[in-house]
Amino acid sequence: HQRDGFARREMAANLCVGDEPPLVTVYFQAYNHLEDQTKMAIHAILENTQNVDYELLLVDNGSTDGTLDFFRSIEHPRKRIFHVRENRGALFGYLAAKGAAGNEFIRGRYFAAIPSDVVVTKDWLKNLVTCMESDPRIGMVVPAANYTSYYQQVKLEFSTYGEMQEAAAAYNVSDPKKWEERLRLIPTASLMRSSLRKMYEADYGFFYNFADDDLSFTYRRLGYRLMFCRDTFVYHAPGTAMSEEAYQTDLREGRETFRRKYFGVDAWTDTRLDDELCRKCMDPSTPREDNRILGIDVRCGANLLHFKNCLRAYDLGRATLSAFVQEAKYWVDLKTICSGEVFCQPLRDLEAALEGRTYDYIILGMPLADYEDPKALLEIMRDHLSIGGRMAGRMEEDGEVFSLERYE
């Protein structure tokens, strides 16, 4: 009754939102930078958020440059302003505003967060909502950006603000083939279900870095899908408010906090995408109604999802994901993305576990050279390939990709 659980969460979240709630609550927090960031960001929201019923939730987090007066001057039919007198960080600003508002802080069915250094573009919110409403299991969606990480970057040609908006307007055409399910998301901007936000919005053990990774893992383990919308572009100004030394310190501490919380899972190495490996394994000449895909030692399964996304993008059919891993710490996350079997056993049990099963694609997550008997492993993989099936992996860490096909 998982779907019933989704519906009950939505119903509970909507109990205290008052009459005629908006579809989306757009949240924007600012601390100074009125002229070089805030005005541009707000004007972009007002100009480019069309055909979506939204409220504007504005938080002035202790600014001293006239930000509050600017917020008051904004014309929008559904606008709420919160003024935090002293800046103690972005999280405190959010919590202070939330505490002042009570149960009606987030009124929309969906919650969109826009950082002050992000400029939205034409149809950004309409496109994200379209993706979100395509499946009740989708919990969070994010757009592409010019400056981001984890394969969420899209490069558009422009040299001025106007050119950027024109290029983005041409680019932002909703296309389900460009929606990619991910293990984790980097939210330059984001749209999430308010029901999830109200249930779990942050682990305060993370100061800055890895808080988003934690959010991704939590929502996915609750049964929700995380979607990257490659069909939508927003502009993210490069840079960080932290000093380089403080940033690197927070990276190290956040990464270790994440490892401890998730019993050894590393948010970087265990969710790594290998685009070259997936594309060299894929056979674009052979569409199938259902592609059976097995990942061996694929950690949390990022490459399994990426392969599934590639098949979708090229109209090569659906995908049923299965996995075999030797380390138990990956089992839970693989179960969140695999509709097929997930085996967690020593490698010596691989052949017995796969008995009677064949796959159209087999992806090897670890370098072949790291196995004690690479030849025996390749023979097992070959024996469990369907006729015309393919298997691929890397010979060594960051070495060449090998791809083999079974003809008979």
Where are the language model's segments positioned?
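Short beta-strand-to-loop acidic/aromatic patch adjacent to the donor-nucleotide binding site
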Residues: R107-V119
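A recurrent flexible, glycine/aromatic-enriched loop bordering the glycosyltransferase active site
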Residues: A169-M192
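Glycine-rich, basic loop-to-helix element that forms the pyrophosphate-binding segment
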Residues: V84-F105
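A conserved acidic beta->alpha catalytic loop
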Residues: D60-D69
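Conserved donor NDP-sugar-binding/catalytic core segment of glycosyltransferases
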Residues: V119-E157
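Short, acidic, metal-binding catalytic loop of nucleotide-sugar glycosyltransferases
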Residues: H43-D53, R312-A313
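Donor nucleotide-sugar recognition loop
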Residues: V119, R182-A189, K198-Y235
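Non-catalytic membrane-proximal stalk/linker segments that position and tether the catalytic domains
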Residues: H1-P22, A170-N172, Y247-E289
